[in-house]
């Protein structure tokens, strides 16, 4: 029987040979994200990976692909007193809103600026850059309407990837209006697409009545002539949305962020209002969006709170790491942690002394390891080299009798005898 990971799920593994799946690269990306988020004044919130389906039906949208096609639903046991259906989270924003409300974070000084990261799950058609189990870096701001905040979250994401050396990105922005001006735009879309319904896919026909903005998000009919001539949201914005839109563009220009206006961006979730954006990289082809987000001023009210503005983004970790690999950007991962000391022992008398030294090294804050397979000294040295150890402390029975050990500096190839009770201080001096 051959057991493999489910299709669309990936193992993240220790070792450079695994490319974008190298766990150290993931750790570095997470570290950089945390550092940048904290520089911007964001604090971490860790929501559960499972939420009630109702949260996504009402928050994300009952007609979205996520809810109708892509969620990994969980059916509780029959004897579960709380028998409502649950689902693995397909995205972060709705769960973070729920946590903000349930835990009364609105009572804290506002706005609330939070970040989160971790796995999410969608039953996708697996292809390059699109998986069923994927990971996101997420930031959200609750309680601020200022378009400067929209610009801030865009800049935050750009600062993260800039630390990784990633350039050549395209920031695409649009505004999809608000509940006051969107009805006119919805009507304009329906008037435009109605004569073409017989030529459009089944999904488009379903969306036509329930959420015509999603017609612009269709991948199957993206090249249909009616798509290219469809009305654009910017022509239907109310005065408030237009001021917000112009404010966003002004802030992006002031920050020196190049952008393009793409009126086809509507995002795939129903909660968006006003600003929507995507950051693209051409190396990913059809899945060129590394991250995207926007404003959702009605979501908190939909989930059960008071009317509260919000804005944020979700960045695909897999996609960022895949692009870094394709661009050959390995410098951010060059400072890979090394094993400080490998303790090589030879003979029964040396073994307990080596183990005692091993734990003393670790207690002193030095990473250390020892052979557990009974290998020869030559094999232990070879293994220490593969572990990229800085030093090897060699203990044989003669060294134990003399109260010393041989310390080999692996980078320099030098070796010297050091009293056992001075090993740690010797290594610290060597590193100074």
From Swiss-Prot:
Superkingdom of the source species: Bacteria
Sorted UniProt keywords: Aminoacyl-tRNA synthetase, ATP-binding, Cytoplasm, Ligase, Nucleotide-binding, Protein biosynthesis
Intracellular or extracellular location(s): Cytoplasm
GO CC annotation: cytoplasm
GO MF annotations in UniProt: ATP binding; catalytic activity, acting on a protein; histidine-tRNA ligase activity; transferase activity
Enzymatic reactions: tRNA(His) + L-histidine + ATP = L-histidyl-tRNA(His) + AMP + diphosphate + H(+)
Enzyme Commission no: 6.1.1.21
Alphabetical list of InterPro entries matching this protein: aa-tRNA-synth_II (IPR006195), aa-tRNA-synth_II/BPL/LPL (IPR045864), Anticodon-bd (IPR004154), Anticodon-bd_dom_sf (IPR036621), His-tRNA-ligase (IPR015807), HisRS-like_core (IPR041715), HisRS/HisZ (IPR004516), HisRS_anticodon (IPR033656)
Keyword Aminoacyl-tRNA synthetase (UniProt): yes
Biological process (GO), any one: histidyl-tRNA aminoacylation
NCBIfam families attached to this UniProt entry: hisS (TIGR00442)
Subunit (UniProt): Homodimer.
Similarity-based family: Belongs to the class-II aminoacyl-tRNA synthetase family.
Protein name per Swiss-Prot or TrEMBL: Histidine--tRNA ligase
Species of the source: Symbiobacterium thermophilum (strain DSM 24528 / JCM 14929 / IAM 14863 / T)
Lineage, opening ranks: Bacteria, Bacillati, Bacillota, Clostridia, Eubacteriales
